[in-house]
Amino acid sequence: MKKIAVSAIALTIAAVGFASVAQAQQLAQPAGKLFFEGDIVRHALPNQAGPFCVLVNQYKRGEAVAFRIRTLLPNGQIADDKAIKSLVVELGNGQRLPAGYKPHGAPPTDFFWSFFWTIPADHPTGSIGYKVIATMNDGSTVEWKPFNRATTALMVVAGEPEMKK
């Protein structure tokens, strides 16, 4: 009987402790917090050979990187252009590139934020850091950065894009 009473007290204390932790986690999420999903794929440019819309992290000067970003609210709902005022990708050099929320596929099968950036002919080789900045309708901002691993980062490599034959 004594063991049961002690077990019941311990269980009650544990349950109250876990409830407090869960409540603290809920309170720690400020309004406007987002979850990000994203990738980069090779974007089709005229006369280039492709393949396109494939996941790659190494690009040659003159090739185009397509940034694809999905944003979710804490409740799991999509954060579209009605929930977010603007979404930009800021490259490591400070250049900001705006994304648009639009359908993708023909016919459209998905909606997400996207844009493409053609790597300039004079861009230095090496990895390019970037981050995504979402500005909410209330003016607050939320940032996301991809993994910080040089081998998987967006990278400019030497060479010319392969052209159609």
Show which residues each predicted segment covers.
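Bacterial N-terminal signal peptides that target proteins for export
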Residues: 1-9
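C-terminal segment of classical bacterial N-terminal signal peptides
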Residues: 14-23
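Hydrophobic beta-strand positions in extracellular immunoglobulin-like domains
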Residues: 71, 117-119, 134
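Beta-strand-rich domain onsets/edges
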Residues: 25-66, 70-72, 159-165
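Short beta-strand elements
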Residues: 140-165
